[in-house]
Design a protein with these regions (language model features):
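Short amphipathic helix-loop junctions that connect adjacent transmembrane helices
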Residues: 27-39, 232-247
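Structural signature of the two symmetry-related core transmembrane helices
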Residues: 71-85, 278-293
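C-terminal membrane-cytosol helix-exit motif in multi-pass small-molecule transporters
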Residues: 167-189
Length: 347
């Protein structure tokens, strides 16, 4: 299987996985709120998902090094499907939180495996573009998913999108089984299997790198905006303060996602051409300004303007931090490095 065929295959798989997350994103806060709980518990539905990823990313990276990438790319969607199906069946907030944790675990398995898979098939000069392509697939799924989720919830009920996502997870696992060959080399497997206990610290040497820790801080900020603000607080604010309905929320989130779809490939090209740091600094600033506007906005147009600015910044930043981490890591650190990188994003 040629490199670009592998890239296309992993991108299709990512679209399917992330469409599921996009489908539930606009309705999750409303679904949790329907249990009559506090705003803190509504936010906990996102926290539970993120906590599972936080705890799973590094073990997933190590598992990818030891047992191969395919197990994560197939098993992750199946675990997510189970979590989503259970979320739809939940009759208390605590059951919902438990199944959200399971769904997050599956998400971590897949996304960590997919990132390592990309680094296996990309040269150093291609990393920005390959990561951008996969993030573009992610944005397609997350971007178009909300409109579908809003329409499904409006047509049926708030639990139906979870069942749709569960079916999609099973289909993704089947697709990955037939279309994604193993990319871990025999030499990588031998190193991971035979490494002596005394050599283990070398895998974590990146934690002593100032550059790695700084890009980790940037990653924390970018992912916090996406999950903590855009997926939790923004839907509630738009619904409660500006009166948007669930289908309107879905369309707005889709529009924001389209910004990323348009910008992510040029961002990957720029990352490879001009360097990672040149992209990271100005776009991180743009994200901060956009969220500041959202925080003080008292009109819908101003609120949407702030959201748009943060979406533009997030889209252009996209591939740069991951490519930067890949540049810092040696081949035997790859699984641990990507696990740590994704852990920063889930803090």
């Amino acid at each position: 299987m040629k490199t670009y065929e592998q890239l296309i295959a992993i991108c299709i798989s990512t679209v399917l996985v992330m469409a599921g997350q996009g489908i539930v994103s606009p309705i999750l806060p409303l679904y949790a709120d329907s249990f009559g709980v506090s705003t803190a518990l509504v936010g906990a539905t996102v926290t539970a998902f993120g906590l599972a990823r936080l705890l799973t990313n590094v073990p997933a990276g190590m598992l990818a090094d030891r047992s191969g990438r395919r197990k994560l790319l197939i098993g992750g969607p199946l675990v997510t499907a189970f979590g989503m199906f259970g979320s739809g069946l939940a009759n208390t907030i605590w059951i919902l939180l438990g199944f959200r944790f399971v769904a997050g675990l599956g998400s971590a398995l897949y996304m960590t495996g997919a990132t390592i898979y990309l680094l296996d098939i990309a040269s150093a000069e291609q990393r920005g573009r390959f990561i951008a392509a996969n993030q573009g697939a992610l944005l397609v799924g997350v971007g178009f998913g909300p409109a579908l989720g809003g329409l499904i919830a409006d047509r049926y009920d708030l639990s139906m999108p979870f069942y749709v996502v569960a079916v999609g997870g099973v289909l993704t696992a089947v697709y990955s089984f037939f279309r994604l060959p193993e990319t871990r080399s025999a030499e990588q497997a031998r190193i991971a299997r035979d490494v002596a206990p005394g050599d283990q610290p070398s895998r974590w040497a990146l934690l002593r790198s100032t550059d790695f820790l700084l890009v980790g801080v940037v990653t924390i900020g970018v992912f916090s905006v996406r999950a903590g603000v855009r997926q939790t607080l923004v839907p509630l604010q738009l619904s409660d303060s500006f009166g948007l309905k669930v289908d309107e929320l879905g369309l707005l989130f889709t529009a924001l996602g389209l910004i990323g779809v348009v910008l992510i490939w040029p961002a990957g090209l720029a990352t490879d051409r001009f360097g990672r740091k040149t992209i990271i600094v100005p776009t991180a600033t743009l994200i901060a300004v956009g969220i500041g506007i959202v925080a003080v906005a008292d009109t819908l147009p101003l609120f949407i303007a702030g959201l748009t600015m943060s979406a533009v910044g997030s889209s252009i930043t996209g591939p740069a931090p991951a490519a930067y981490v890949a540049d810092l890591a040696t081949e035997d650190q790859r699984g641990a490095a990507m696990g740590l990188y994704r852990t920063f994003g889930d803090i």
